[in-house]
A protein has these predicted regions:
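Ribosome-associated RNA-binding proteins
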Residues: 1-178
């Protein structure tokens, strides 16, 4: 019977509501649904317990995946996740702004209509000149927001060796929250 116990860090609260695990800390809170047949995830005092009655390879790999998700949640609510992006342009100076819950890119390749990307979850976007900094407690929301912004400025139907304009990810967290 495989069983994994994860210690809940200090200054972090974890709660279970049926299939959802909520982790709260200084940087905010993250809720995630963790469900797979024959795998039980529970909060027991100061530990999160992942256990199963099955012992096959698929169940073991899913237990490892759940363990990584919970560790990422702990890291997010204590230290947070941070992505760095840079604005590059050579022909037309583009402006990048935050309007409400959207990132707005104006004058990309001289276009008249602005391009917009949704800011996901509790992601905080800070723009300082030509650098864009994204941070937040949810690894997936921060990473998806960064990816959406990068895809928003993808150059189509032009020679990408000449048209290198865009907003590119230049710094992202490595494996294990490094």
């Amino acid at each position: 019977m495989p069983r994994v116990e994860l210690e809940i860090p200090e200054d972090v609260d974890a709660e279970q509501d049926h299939l959802d695990i909520t982790v709260e800390g200084d940087n905010g809170s993250v809720t995630r649904r963790l469900w797979y047949p024959d795998i039980d995830v529970s909060v027991d005092g100061d530990t999160v317990v992942i256990e199963s009655d099955e012992d096959n390879a698929k169940t073991m790999s899913t237990i490892g995946t759940f363990q990584s998700h919970i560790e990422n949640m702990f890291h997010g609510v204590t230290e947070g996740w941070e992505y760095g992006m840079e604005v590059f342009y050579s022909h037309f100076p583009m402006q990048v702004n935050v309007e409400g819950d959207e990132v707005v890119i104006e004058n990309f390749l001289g276009e008249k209509a602005p391009r917009r990307a949704q800011i996901r979850g509790d992601t905080d976007v800070q723009i300082d000149g030509e650098s864009v900094l994204l941070n937040g407690p949810d690894k997936e929301a921060v990473g998806q927001t960064a990816g959406d912004i990068e895809q928003l400025t993808r150059v189509k139907d032009k020679d990408t060796r000449v048209f290198q304009d865009g907003v590119y990810i230049v710094e992202k967290p490595g494996a294990g929250g490094a």
